[in-house]
Amino acid sequence: MARLCTHTESGHYLMALDAGTGSVRAVIFDLQGKQIAVGQAEWQHLAVPDVPGSMEFDLAKNWQLACQCIRQALQKAAIPATAIAAVSACSMREGIVIYDSNGEPIWACANVDARAAHEVSELKELHDNTFEEEVYRCSGQTLALSAIPRLLWLAHHRPDIYHRASTVTMISDWMAFMLSGELAVDPSNAGTTGLLDLVTRNWKRSLLQMAGLRSDILSPVKETGTLLGHISQKAAEQCDLQAGTPVIVGGGDVQLGCLGLGVVRPAQTAVLGGTFWQQVVNLPAPVTDPNMNVRINPHVIPGMVQTESISFFTGLTMRWFRDAFCAEEKLIAERLGIDAYSLLEDMASRVPPGAHGVMPIFSDVMRFKRWYHAAPSFINLSIDPEKCNKATLFRALEENAAIVSACNLQQIAAFSGVQADSLVFAGGGSKGKLWSQILADVTGLTVHVPVVKEATALGCAIAAGVGVGIWPSLAETGEKLVRWDREHKPNPENFAVYQQAREKWQAVYQDQRALVDGGLTTSLWKAPGL
């Protein structure tokens, strides 16, 4: 039976629309930041026949799924649409949507679209091979994931789309447009196009002109947490929201996730442990890495930027290990009514720090300018089953994820001068108590784990609330609403063990990259254009 709601007046709830890589969600929060209801649907991105690397975003079908989620969330919450004070949207970064002169969305691609590899290579040769460096110094982005090569691909291969293009936005902005009929982008998400100036938080049209592309297709820029428009009558009929409800500018998923975690002040640091792991450090002013190893993104907090390093497929690697090798543990966990990862962590806790010298080779540290990884493998295995078994390999994977994170944080500190004294660990990985402790031991930092570990939707709801005056500011509200689950202090003895393990791993990984360079092994992943 649906829960009865005692608050029937307008304005007691906020809705966040969260468009992730694999699913879309509509999440309803109360004004204390508590999640009340969620509607969720998976979506698939479409590979276009004969277009290698393509991943188009199905605009018509995905809007239907978003509307389905909104209706489902309202039904689960058992509240009228008039109880929603405001709506905001967030999404995966890098995905873009193209609109024609009538404001109709005509083409879109997901963040994982890699069709423009040739265009990336072509663009790198511009300005005596300095164009990518110019893009990075201005925007904090390289060409691999930016919008510039994708627009060039459209000019080359889909001129029918390119010449009709009137506006480009991100996917979060598309959802807000479908609700309100208003087009704008925010800096945190649009920053990942490689076209936004980190200092001015506005478009750098000259970058498109340098690439020989049109510079008249850029949307207005509005800050996260400001009013975009209101729910249109058409959208109200499609998704059951109340016409006239304010629609507030949202943002990028990672930056809004940091807002929901209270990571809103200079030097605050977070490790977000999902399919990919992001290591994020807030900087008080825009600065880029002379070595171009890490990306720099606008935060949702005006005037602030974030350095962001990425560890590839960290969560996916753990899932692969569980599903490929741990069928017995999955069965036991199911019978015990616990999560299989919890059982594996319990087993791994009996393995000494350093995992008997086993070195997983999966994600490298981030090298944004020349971004590729070695072939997946385990190095330095033993044939002693007491020392080398599933528990050892599982612990080694957890340790390796922490080592890559520590290396990435070290890279950030080296060019920014910002040295963290603690970090926030969130996302699915932070559910593991052993993993949280290993992260503290490897980095030498105190690790804080929040109660709400998936905070992107909460950050989006905060933006909605600030936009209608429920809360005074993004930063103040993020700090106010975050609650902490536990704290992990680093063990100095373990830290010393991991320092040695880290040095060995870095040396071995370079040799493994050389095998990829020689064509002897296959990279875990390569950026387009390499």
Swiss-Prot record:
It is an enzyme of class 2 (transferase). GO terms for cellular component: cytoplasm. GO terms for molecular function: autoinducer-2 kinase activity. Keywords: Cytoplasm, Kinase, Transferase. It holds the Pfam family FGGY_N. Belongs to the FGGY kinase family. It comes from Salmonella typhi. Catalyzes the phosphorylation of autoinducer-2 (AI-2) to phospho-AI-2, which subsequently inactivates the transcriptional regulator LsrR and leads to the transcription of the lsr operon. Phosphorylates the ring-open form of (S)-4,5-dihydroxypentane-2,3-dione (DPD), which is the precursor to all AI-2 signaling molecules, at the C5 position. InterPro entries: AI-2_kinase, ATPase_NBD, Carb_kinase_FGGY, FGGY_C, FGGY_Carb_Kinase, FGGY_N. This is Autoinducer-2 kinase. The keyword Transferase applies. The lineage of its organism: Bacteria, Pseudomonadati, Pseudomonadota, Gammaproteobacteria, Enterobacterales. GO terms for biological process: carbohydrate metabolic process; quorum sensing. It catalyses: (S)-4,5-dihydroxypentane-2,3-dione + ATP = (2S)-2-hydroxy-3,4-dioxopentyl phosphate + ADP + H(+). The keyword Lyase does not apply. Its EC number is 2.7.1.189. PANTHER family: AUTOINDUCER-2 KINASE, SUGAR KINASE. CDD domains: ASKHA_NBD_FGGY_AI-2K (cd07775). It is found in: Cytoplasm.
